[in-house]
Amino acid sequence: GLICYSTIDVKQPATSLTIKEDKILKVVKGYSGQYTTEMGPSDTTDKITWKSDLPSVVSVNSNGNITANKVGIAKITATTTSGIKVVHYVRVKLKTPTGVKLTKKSKKITKKKKSYRVTVKWTKNTNAVKYYVYRRLSTKSSYTRIATTTKPKYIDTKVKKNKKYYYKIKAIYSNTKLNSDKTPAYA
């Protein structure tokens, strides 16, 4: 007799796909990271294909590595060979303003009276349409928005001599979901 041997390659399709990161990932321009996935069953032979609906905003490679290219929101889709799809979103926000500097000056109004002012400056964010300036009067009080400006500078004229003020700046985008976080406090 004749004996015939053959190898059969059995494919094990995925029955589940999970992405460990938050459904909406909030990052700033320049962020790079990788999605962590889990496919079941553990012996699946499926592969994952990644796709971004807006690669100019967020690009994704074949390993699930993402790069935030510009401010906006992109939909990232992971699809298994057997057709299971999981959709996540990446929200690329404005960067928090940097380079904040405070300058306190006095100006003589009359011989006996002076006015005081604090100039707050920061590095311009090219994607910001405006900035919110917040101030608080002590470490125990809460911040109040005192101004909206389109320039990376604000002059606070409602200040008193020998009093400490705390400021925070927030960069604003045309879509409020993409606004920056507030800066740390500056006094």
Model-derived features with residue positions:
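Extracytoplasmic soluble-region selector
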Residues: G1-L94
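Short beta-strand segments enriched for Tyr within beta-sheet-rich domains
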Residues: G33, Y131, Y165-I169
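Predominantly extracellular/luminal cell-surface or secreted proteins
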Residues: K51-D53, Y134-T139, K168-I172
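Short beta-strand segments within Ig-like beta-sandwich modules, predominantly Fibronectin type-III
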Residues: V57-V60, R145-T150
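Hydrophobic core positions of the immunoglobulin-like beta-sandwich fold
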Residues: I66, Y154-T157
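Pro/Thr/Ser/Gly-rich low-complexity, intrinsically disordered linker/stalk tracts
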Residues: L94-N127, K161, T176-A187
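Extracellular low-complexity, O-glycosylation-prone stalks/linkers
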Residues: N125-R145
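Beta-strand-rich modules
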Residues: D156-K177
